[in-house]
Amino acid sequence: MTAPDLISIEDFFGAPERTGASISPDGSRIAYLAPWRNRLNVWIQDLEEGSEARCVTADDVRSVLDYRWTDDPRWLLYLQDSGGDENHHVFRVDLHDPEADAVDLTPFPGSRVYSLEQSRDKDGVFTLAMNARSLAEFDLYELVIATGELTVIGESPGPGTGWSAGVGGDLLLSEFTDQGHMKISRRRAGSDDVTHVTTFDGSDYPYGVTLTHPTADGTGVLIDSVTNSDLTVLARIDLETGEETVVDSHPSMELDASRRAVEQSGSPLIFSRSTGELIGVRYLGERQVIHAVDADFAEVLKNVEALSDGDVGALSSDDSGKKWVVGFTHDRDPNVTYFYDHETGESRMLFRPYPHLDPRDMAVMTPVTIEARDGLPLPSYLTLPVGVEPANLPMVVLVHGGPWYRDAWRYTPGVQFLANRGYAVLQVNFRGSTGYGKAHTQAAIGEFAGKMHTDLVDGVEWAVAQGYADRDRVAIMGGSYGGYAALVGATFTPEVFAASIDYVGVSDLANFMRTQPAFARPGLVNNWYRYVGDPAIPEQEADMLARSPISRLDDVTRPLMIAQGANDARVVKAESDNVVERLRARGVEVDYLVFDDEGHGFVNPENNITFYRAVEKFLAEHLGGRAK
């Protein structure tokens, strides 16, 4: 067996040549993201083969990652924050005037925008939620694209509430009650009266009901529901009666709602661009399954899925529903993007984002199930290096964030980089992960630094018993909650992990919760407060401290690396500073990287390259993997 050559860090973590394509409403053009001055920007290109592409945004500070077509071919919108602070603003681009600068349509200091949606009822109008009036509250606005006029159509009645647009001028209000339940109400067009529709048990929804999409006829709302099921299904709430009925479900997979909400990667529901009718539903198990609930879309889906052995990812159509652009999720050949014309049957590849990466040199991501010590099944993924005997390998346990999230089958540059350096990579969907039923998620209540962590240790034991991993050469690495898990590995079980890498991770659970932005706190009731505790209650604060790595730094005996974004609004830099200062004060070496222009996760390519160059050196020194 021959291992592939070392692939450069730049090839893994540099910007893709093209990615994120979607088709225009009239079907004549595509937009996509591609580098301009080493930052991803939006480019426009006619669909005719051989046509010239044009860059229409000009951000050389931070990559543009989110853009929207509008129903007017003149305007395109995109969202951008500053240095990773997550305070996204809406910018307008004039596609008819290449010399015109982008215009910030929400120029309010300290505010952030989310839920930017094309109006169903008014041409040239988007709705958006923004906290410009009060940083703790999000009001709903109508935005006239051509003029930039903003009008409040739903003022927040208080923190923990949010309006969304219904049909025909109706508005829907979602709000957390004092008990943490989630209440949905309706305000009819032309009325100030808000009428209660239904209330959900908040304990079943760590992030609340993440999906509330009005039906095309305006009589109901589509939601992700676990009312009568362990697995999340698609249900409809009747806005007159509050009655809930199941619209679609899968016998063994969950509706892929919560993961997509965390990633902000779009709805699990697929709608007709012209009618707004539901046509498809995404479920996720080991791989994705899409249920077509419309006969015409079923034919489209059959032909589109035949283009790749990957899973259908980003999918867009023109208004006619005949022309489609689709990117595919894949473990070794990411986001290969095709054009498909359903009327003519024509299809062609538009691009591969990373043409310099040979899929044959990439490692296969294999689903495995590991049994925890108490018998709980742990759906996991194992990636083994190419061209290496899969025995007694150095291994990295890569822990996902959230923790109310899940790992899924797809290309991850960090995983492929580690595999190329000779490491086995194990990703465990430990208890608390979403996507496997509410019982799997709720098994994590009270188990931070407890069974959530022993699930990871059990994953190590499984990999050693299977012969894949060398017990003495196992590292733990992760971001956000995964960074917390890495610190728990370094402080609670230093005998298990030869090295730990914390990426924007929590070190002090109580301090983490105290430093959350005001607008986020009402949403913590069913996740952090329910699963971990309330730092305002002394007994619970003491328990949180006992489960925090900051309280056990004297137990750090193995090598530790920490990486932090200076502008992180979720896990503030002080979380990492405190760990580093205390360890260094007693003479313990810790590698510490701080990136001044990043937040909760790194975006700029040069920062990711710097970070993974340090990871490569750190792991090679302490686990013995390959390095340049």
Question: Where are the regions that the model predicts?
Answer:
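Residue-level signal for short, function-critical loop segments
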Residues: 284, 401-402, 480, 566
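Hydrophobic/aromatic beta-strand patches that form the interior of the parallel beta-sheet core
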Residues: 127, 279, 368, 397, ...
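Sequence/structural signature of beta-propeller modules
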Residues: 1-3, 7
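Peripheral, non-catalytic segments that deliver or gate enzyme domains
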Residues: 13-19, 25, 29, 33-45, ...
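Short hydrophobic segments within beta-strands
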Residues: 224, 383, 398-399, 477, ...
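A fold-wide structural signal in alpha/beta-hydrolase
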Residues: 395, 419-429, 591
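Active-site-proximal cap/loop segments of hydrolase catalytic domains
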Residues: 430-628
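Short beta-strand element of the alpha/beta-hydrolase
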Residues: 391-401
